[in-house]
Structures are given as structure tokens and as C-alpha cells.
Amino acid sequence: MARVAIIDYGINNVRSVRNAVEYCGHEAVVTHGNEGIADASHIILPGVGAFGDAMKKIRDRGLDEVLARSVCEAGKPLLAVCLGMQLLAKTSEEHADGGVFFQGLGLIEADVRRLRPKDPDLKIPHMGWNNITKLREHPILANMRETNLAFYFVHSFAMSCENEDDVVGRATYGQDVTAIVARDNIVGTQFHPEKSQDSGIELMSNFLQWNP
């Protein structure tokens, strides 16, 4: 059984993530700082809201340093969800003041850009169910059928990766949308697995059994 630290930095809704972890048969601990992370086998970084606000709260609580120690040094598996995935990037143009982009955690070589679908009838945010295309094999998608790769999205920005090898899955919404990224012991999903019914639970279960 995995012991999962779910990071609550003040603007994310952790209840549905906790419910999903427990539904998969694992122990979930919600933490606001370093407590709980040291004893955890896996870490989940959820997120909703604005990139700049989230990064400020993370830095104010010292969570950037906690993640560096736990993920980069100790090698604990990290799943970052929605805004959490975007926070893995180096920068984001969301609400950039005078063209100065917000700095992210820098765990993935990527930048976050606003969705600009070519079809003017497609509304922003991208909200609802969408299928993803698997670009490469990864344990997060182990034993998942191509016909069971529909997930629930709610976002206006998306990650643009410098290294295409970091992209595991991609969706289409008038443009290519990075849906899953992975590097070493880090995985990010732009969609919400905890809101994606059977496919989301299967993906979450894969993460909780993953020991990179």
C-alpha cells in the first residue's frame, strides 16, 4: 500500500484527489508543508487557479525546497495535476506583467502558454472530456486500452515542452495540447484523473503502484 502525501498550498481542492487515492486502496495524507512528506512513498501536487498565485504560496511555505529534496534528491514519485502540472515548467505567461513571465518549479524543461485554438468557435477554457493520443509507453498508462484514454480537462493554458521525449500523451483542441508529461520519477497530467471516472482511476492506480 502506498502512503500518499497530497500537497495543499491553499488554493487547490484536494478532497476529490484524496477520495480517488483512497478508492484505489491507498493511504492519503493531506499536508501543508514538510510534515507527512518525509514518510510518504508518493506525492501528488494538485492545482486550480492562477499560476502566479500558486507559485507565491508554494514559495512562501517553502514547498519548492521540500519538493526539490523529496522528488529530485530522494526520488519519490510525483504526480502533478492540472495547474500542478503547469507549475513543473520553467515559466508561464499567465497574467505576465509587462511581458515578464512567472517562474515555475523548473522540474520539466517547458514553458506554459495560453491556448490559442485555430478554430474561433472553440471556447476558452478548454472544458470537458477529450481523448488523448499516447505518444510513447510509460507506466502511468500501463495496460490502458487506446479506447479508454478519455479524460476530463479544465484549463486555459498548456505546457510547451522543449524536449518532445518528455511528452507521453497529447490531446487536440484546435491545436496540439500536451496532456501528459513525464521525466524520471515525475509525471504531470493536464487533465483531472480524479474527475475522469474509470480511466482516471486506472491511471491513478498505475501511478500509486509505480516505483521508478
Give, region by region, the residue ranges found by the protein language model:
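Extreme N-terminal starter segment of soluble prokaryotic enzymes
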Residues: 1-5
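Structural signature of beta-strand start/N-cap positions in the alpha/beta core
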Residues: 27, 42, 77-79
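Short acidic low-complexity segments
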Residues: 28-38
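Short acidic/histidine-rich motifs immediately flanking catalytic phosphotransfer sites
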Residues: 37-47
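Cysteine-nucleophile active-site neighborhood
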Residues: 49-127
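Pocket-forming structural segment of enzyme catalytic cores
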Residues: 92-172
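Short, surface-exposed beta-strand/loop micro-motifs that present aromatic residues
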Residues: 175-182
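Acyltransferase
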Residues: 189-212
